[in-house]
Amino acid sequence: MKDNIELAIFTPEKNIKIGEIKEVITEGLDGDLAILPNHVNMITYLKPTITKYIDLNGNKNNIFTSSGVLKVEDNKVYIICDASEKPEDIDIKRAENAKKRAEERLRNKKEIDVKRAELALFRSIARIKIKEL
């Protein structure tokens, strides 16, 4: 039995190797997921959210992850997503503007792809929330 898990996040632009940690908490399509050491192997879809992880010193950390896939295999957690940003890398003005645009598009549903606008709204809200933590 292992005491830790490894976390790595992959996006088209970058790979983020977090390394060994104690726990990962993120959000799948069916709700929150908590991954601890010795978790059963699995694959699931993820929503845009604030993914939380606890490092080996017990510090709580946050990182934005967009929609994607999470894979757990042999105490390794892989998140493959469209985008991932640490709080310090998020442009809050850009996120707020994206939120306003998405909300406006959703108000005018006749002219837009609703699913795409909803995802844009989820992404912008998660980016704003992570800056507020």
From Swiss-Prot:
It comes from the Bacteria. It is a peripheral membrane protein. GO terms for molecular function: ATP binding; proton-transporting ATP synthase activity, rotational mechanism. It holds the Pfam family ATP-synt_DE_N. GO terms for cellular component: plasma membrane; proton-transporting ATP synthase complex. Its main location: membrane. Keywords: ATP synthesis, Cell membrane, CF(1), Hydrogen ion transport, Ion transport, Membrane, Transport. CDD domains: F1-ATPase_delta. It is found in: Cell membrane. Coiled coil: none annotated. Belongs to the ATPase epsilon chain family. F-type ATPases have 2 components, CF(1) - the catalytic core - and CF(0) - the membrane proton channel. CF(1) has five subunits: alpha(3), beta(3), gamma(1), delta(1), epsilon(1). CF(0) has three main subunits: a, b and c. PANTHER family: ATP SYNTHASE DELTA/EPSILON CHAIN, ATP SYNTHASE EPSILON CHAIN, CHLOROPLASTIC. Produces ATP from ADP in the presence of a proton gradient across the membrane. This is ATP synthase epsilon chain. It comes from Clostridium botulinum (strain Langeland / NCTC 10281 / Type F).
